[in-house]
Amino acid sequence: MIDRKALLNDLKQQVKAVEADLGKQVKALDEVGARLRAEYDQARKLGRTAATWNSWLDERVTQVAVAWVLGTVFVRFCEDNRLIPEPYVTGPDNYRRDLAETRYDVYVEADDDPTYRGWLRRAFAELGDGQAGRLLFDSDHNPLYQIPLSHDGARELVEFWRQRDEEGALVHDFTDPLSADGTEGWGTRFLGDLYQDLSEAARKTYALLQTPEFVEEFILDRTMNPAVREFGYEELKMIDPTCGSGHFVLGAFRRLVRLGGENQPGKDVHQRVRAALDSVHGVDINPFAVAIARFRLLVAAMAASGVRTLDEASKYEWPVHLAVGDSLIKSGSQQGSLFGESDDDLTDELAEFKYATEDVGEHPEMLRPGRYHVVVGNPPYITVKDKSLNALYRELYPACAGKYALSVPFAQRFFELAKREDAEGSGYGMVGQITANSFMKREFGTKLIEGYFGHAVELTEVIDTSGAYIPGHGTPTVILVGTRRGGDGRSPVIRTVRSVQGEPVAPENAEEGLVWRAIVEQIDKPGSVSQWVSVDDLDREKYFSKQPWVLADGGQEMLEQINAASHAILKRDLHRIGFYGIMGADDAMSAVPRTFRRNNAESEYVRRLVVGDEVRDFRIADGDDAFHPYGSQRDLVGPDAFPNLAAWLWPYRTELGGRATFSGGTYFADGRPWWEWHQLPKDVGAHAWSLNFAFVATHNHVVLDRSGCAFTRTAPVIKLREGASEEEHLRLLGLLNSSTAGFWLKMVSYPKGGDPVGDEGARVSVHPWSDRYEFTGTKLQEFPLPSEYPTGLGTALDALAQRLAAASPAAVAAEAVPIAGLLREARTRWEAIRSRMIALQEEMDWQVYSLYKLHSEDLRVSEDPDDTNIPELTLGGRAFEIVLARRVAAGEASDEWFKRHNSTPITEIPAHWPAPYREIVQKRIDAIESNRAIGMVERPEYKRRWATEGWDALQEKALRSWLLDRMENRDLWCDENGQPTILTLARLTDALSRDEDFASVAKLYAPRKELAKVVAELITDEHVPFLSALRYKPSGLKKRADWEEVWDLQRKEDAAPDEPAKRKIRDSIPVPPKYTSADFLRPSYWKARGKLDVPKERFVSYGQTNAATPELYGWAGWDHREQAQALATYFTNTALSTKEITPFLAGLLELQPWLSQWHNEFDMLYSGSPADFFAGYRQQKQGEHGLTDDDLRGWRPPAATRRRRAAAKQ
């Protein structure tokens, strides 16, 4: 029996080895390369692909490599299970192993050109003999015949299969004896594992994903069973247009064989098997998926018919209707409309074109619309990366819109293939699919829902499986069942399974998961409700005619209740809602504020840049700044206005100019200024302030920005019209931060994921409150507005948030030396303010319930936010938390909410609260337990988490930042003449020890550590070496060389006499490669520099080795002249050997181009230009030590030596 995991792991390596071999073969064999290139050119011409030649070829090589490896898998399976009489490669016992080797020896002696490749092809030919096996190794289409494996490559593959372990047993033994009745043994499920994970590149390209058998069986129950009841089984036709490794096809085949045996036991078994094979069909774009499906179906047919060898199978006419091709591609005339009409008679050139690996064209009826009684499958969920295919599918399938996922065109295609009604209006084919549920709430799904599903077809069942544990399915899913009936003849209701609660823990057996079992057991019981799901026949028009679909139990009803209390929607009051702008170059244009200060950036062109994660609890957390080259009217300003910033950005000019534009060109090609943002609306007619919200978060977070920050796409803006009052802003701030708004948004928004259950990629989370959602402006602008607003509480919370920020450790440290007394006082204020905010948020939530008529009574303590009857609240003391704590105590709920938020659960209303507040809280608890609407929204999923790092963590971070800022004091890094100087760590520590404020804060930061240790630890992750060879690994040094070449060309461009000459040079400059973390010698260097290698570190380190904490440091705020001065001063004043001075001279050589660029003017200090001075001085030193420029460029640090562990004491 095969070890599935070991086989998969080993074969992954074999595929990589074969890919490498085939890549060499393509280059060595001109005919092969030319043939593939011609195929690619034709495909690109017809719009079948927009991929580059190299990426297309890489994908084809992967397909061929997998085909070679899978071919040998099929051979090995047949050898070990005696499907062929004599082995070609090996066998589990010594006899068959020796026989295989002997047979190969005989072949070598007899054949004119014997190779291992030729021997494997003989094995493939034997397996492919006969009508059923022919498709397995069809030389016209099987990818392995596209590129010949080398003799050595084939030999290594054979030798791999012959490996034995220490006991002499075959490492990969496929023996799986078939039982007498053919129902057990010959298992091929392992091939599904190979299909999904054999090639990482293929898995990503085709979104390979196995459908678990229990899901496949369920969908066949809901589709094939009714089809058999209506049409019978003998003439039934089924297809899986995305068949993958064949799970649905095999499931349908086995059902049909069983039905034939039950209903016609006297009929010849071979005829029954033939009839079942003739009924099932499958198509997949992935050649090796279809190869696996064909092999599995052939083995299943043999088992079902009692045939035990391939030779015997070749005597029967067994049709195998499985084809390779893109089942979405059809003639343009078949594109139809959202209402389902199409003309099936015409063809076009693109529909006729097929890749060499595709054979669907040899099955002309396979994809004929209206042919099938059953259409089932699990279509891919990915978006279409290839631009040509994306446009083609959009043209062929009107349901495609926006950034659609493949689930959209496949939803339409599945129904198109299903049988239409007969003359009497009956006889519709059944369609079933498990698919991504993203179309239900993301914008691209609107046309599919409101157009196609709304009119062209009849959905009969919608089953929310997002809460079920389905291994491998990391994307939330839904099962759709229906027919091709459209228009008025459809049933007014749809059987719907809605979610109540997700799977609490990963089940040992996914099929026995609590949610899945509830779905199976309740699906035929409308009106049933369990802890996990509810089942109802819901009105088609009311629940499914408009986007979004809401499949949370009671969710749609709650939305309608909220909407019914609305007097308008949010977009009525807005100038616009959407992105602030798109920088398009965040790595180059943004950095922490100190980086801009260090480079003397022109402050009027630097703005605070806010990301979504910083928008929390009515305030904006500290973060990065951004280059913002715009005036007050958002008109672009030229580099002359910001010379320091322009110099800082100069190294990235080609990268910035090479950015893609909306037209498909580049900034340079389209004549766009290289320094501008990608997109920045002028917002004429909008208020200067903005409300901003977190685009992806577990809960709704909205802030009011009065300071004119810039925001990334993760923090969209809500702009009111010019002239809007502060009150208009604040009333929306309060409303949009309410739990009611959180509920509404989560019902209509797409869930991004949370804390997953299990480790098999199943998209279920234990705690719904930890699920992140995508809150888009398109959804939010439809938010219903009540007639009144929680303006007073919104205003109070906004003011408290500003006070909270002013009491934070970072704010204290910014205003004064952060001594213990100040921090203690600030902590008291901070905790009190935060507790007050928790209390007022609770008041606001309950006020809003009454505004939307979710509860008849306004359960606030008072209309005055400052009322003393409202106590300060700590987490754990809100009404819903008391209810939750009681459920935890009763063993009915998890206590994770309290653990995660460091709060104490309480089951009784605290006696020290004011009496009016205790009474109100009791009423709130009563409402939660008796009012369904309140019970739905008063849950952790919708209540503000107030998640924070906590004071201690905030204080530690603030103290660390203060200490590091103090260590950057320019005076520390200058000598008595004001010139830059390199310091040893000991000298730096000594200087800092004389700073009483530094010493006292360091003691507060790390009370049990010596100052020297504190300074060393602080600087360890904040420095980057002065020399490339000490920063990068070899791969990074190669990229650095590319960047230096780009900079040389940019300097030539700057020196060119006129614009035509400049443009000619500019057009020849390649966009340099981006760095990755793997290019840097230490993670801290990568963290400081990023993929464009932008210097954002605090300190520069010097030395001769790659050390975590070197002995020599400088300040990163030095310009190139100051860096050169510090280096030259150091090796002038320090006695260094040739070996020791080499890296320092190399550092000076690396600075030379920058000195020539920025410091080439006369300077009295150097009696000439600094560039000339340092060049001459370096050359003098090189001469003294006999070093050439190449010696300096070739210098590398010595390899690190591992210290031997001390011997353990005896």
From Swiss-Prot:
InterPro entries: DNA_methylase_N6_adenine_CS, DUF7008, MethylTrfase_TaqI-like_dom, N4_N6_ade-DNA_methylase, SAM-dependent_MTases_sf. Gene3D superfamilies: Vaccinia Virus protein VP39. Residues 1201-1210 have a biased composition (Basic residues). Keywords: Antiviral defense, DNA-binding, Methyltransferase, S-adenosyl-L-methionine, Toxin-antitoxin system, Transferase. Residues 1181-1210 are annotated as: Disordered. Disulfide bonds: none annotated. GO terms for molecular function: DNA binding; site-specific DNA-methyltransferase (adenine-specific) activity. Coiled coil: none annotated. PROSITE patterns: N6_MTASE (PS00092). Residues 1181-1194 have a biased composition (Basic and acidic residues). Pfam families: DUF7008, Eco57I. Its EC number is 2.1.1.72. GO terms for biological process: defense response to virus; DNA modification; methylation. It catalyses: a 2'-deoxyadenosine in DNA + S-adenosyl-L-methionine = an N(6)-methyl-2'-deoxyadenosine in DNA + S-adenosyl-L-homocysteine + H(+). The keyword Transferase applies. Induction: Constitutively expressed, probably part of a pglW-pglX operon. Disruption phenotype: Strain is no longer resistant to plaque formation by bacteriophage phiC31 (a Pgl- phenotype). Phase reversion of this Pgl system is due in part to the expansion and contraction of an 8-base long guanine tract in this protein (corresponding to residues 259-263). The tract has been observed to be 7, 8 and 9 nucleotides long in different derivatives; a 7-G tract yields a 282 residue and the 9-G tract a 336 residue missense protein. BREX systems (bacteriophage exclusion) provide immunity against bacteriophage. Part of a type 2 BREX system. Probably a DNA methyltransferase, it methylates phage DNA in vitro in an S-adenosyl-L-methionine-dependent manner. Previously called the phage growth limitation (Pgl) system, it confers protection against bacteriophage phiC31. The bacteria allows one cycle of phage infection, but subsequent cycles are impaired, protecting the original bacterial colony. The system undergoes high rates (10(-3) to 10(-4)) of phase reversion, i.e. loss and regain of phiC31 resistance. Belongs to the methyltransferase superfamily. PglX adenine methyltransferase family. This is Adenine-specific methyltransferase PglX. It comes from Streptomyces coelicolor (strain ATCC BAA-471 / A3(2) / M145).
